[in-house]
From Swiss-Prot:
InterPro entries linked: Ig-like_dom, Ig-like_dom_sf, Ig-like_fold, Ig_V-set, TCR_beta_variable
Assembly and oligomerization: Alpha-beta TR is a heterodimer composed of an alpha and beta chain; disulfide-linked. The alpha-beta TR is associated with the transmembrane signaling CD3 coreceptor proteins to form the TR-CD3 (TcR or TCR). The assembly of alpha-beta TR heterodimers with CD3 occurs in the endoplasmic reticulum where a single alpha-beta TR heterodimer associates with one CD3D-CD3E heterodimer, one CD3G-CD3E heterodimer and one CD247 homodimer forming a stable octameric structure. CD3D-CD3E and CD3G-CD3E heterodimers preferentially associate with TR alpha and TR beta chains, respectively.
Protein name: T cell receptor beta variable 28
Gene designation: TRBV28
Gene Ontology MF terms in the entry: peptide antigen binding
Species, as recorded: Homo sapiens (Human)
Functional note: V region of the variable domain of T cell receptor (TR) beta chain that participates in the antigen recognition. Alpha-beta T cell receptors are antigen specific receptors which are essential to the immune response and are present on the cell surface of T lymphocytes. Recognize peptide-major histocompatibility (MH) (pMH) complexes that are displayed by antigen presenting cells (APC), a prerequisite for efficient T cell adaptive immunity against pathogens.
Amino acid sequence: MGIRLLCRVAFCFLAVGLVDVKVTQSSRYLVKRTGEKVFLECVQDMDHENMFWYRQDPGLGLRLIYFSYDVKMKEKGDIPEGYSVSREKKERFSLILESASTNQTSMYLCASSL
């Protein structure tokens, strides 16, 4: 019984190791003047349908800004005000701040899933 369980656990770890998803966000650090338009790009390489933009402020958890479940299909999250998004290609999801303000100073995170 013990060796079969060990083999199953090892197989699970091997299966997890075969998946190498890459989600790239640009820019890592970005400083803009108040009122400027800001573009944040997110690119994933696993042909995922779903992509998400989150914001995390000090002392708070992640808050969903926008999500997309396919090309040109986008939905507002919990805090969409002041933001827009674009998804013309499956692998790319852009977050746009039309007019940057000091209350948008934050850490922005992009994610993707099947």
